Amino acid sequence: VVVMNKAIFIKDVFDYEKSQDWKYKGSKPAIIDLYADWCGPCRMVAPIMKELAKEYADKIVVYKVNVDKEKELAALFNATSIPLFVFIPMSGEPQLFRGAADKATYKKAIDDFLLKTE
C-alpha cells in the first residue's frame, strides 16, 4: 500500500494540471483508498486493503489518500463521504465505489473490473 500525495498522484496516476481528459499513467491497474484517521468504516477496511495489496501485489497497486491532508485530491474525486475507492483500469474511465464492504466484494471488483481481459 502506497501512501499518496498530490505529487505522487500527478507523477504516477494522472496529471490533472495539464489535462482534464483522463489518461492513466500507471503500469498496473490501481485502487485509490480515500480515507481519514477519524473514520470508523475506513479503519475497518484498512486491513482488508492491506491484504488485497499483498494478494494482488504483482497485478495491481493500492494507494491510500488521507482526505484531511490531501484536500485537493479529495476534491478531485468529490470525496464527500468516505471511505471512497477509485478503481482504475489500464484503459477506460475509473469507477468510484463508496462505503465500506467485505473482502469478497473488493476481490470481485478487482477480478471483474480491474483484471478483466476483453
Task: Label every model-predicted segment.
Residues S27-A30, L34-W38, S81:
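Short pre-active-site segment immediately N-terminal to redox-active cysteine/selenocysteine motifs
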Residues L34, V45-A53, A57-E72:
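Thiol-based oxidoreductase modules, predominantly thioredoxin-like and allied folds used
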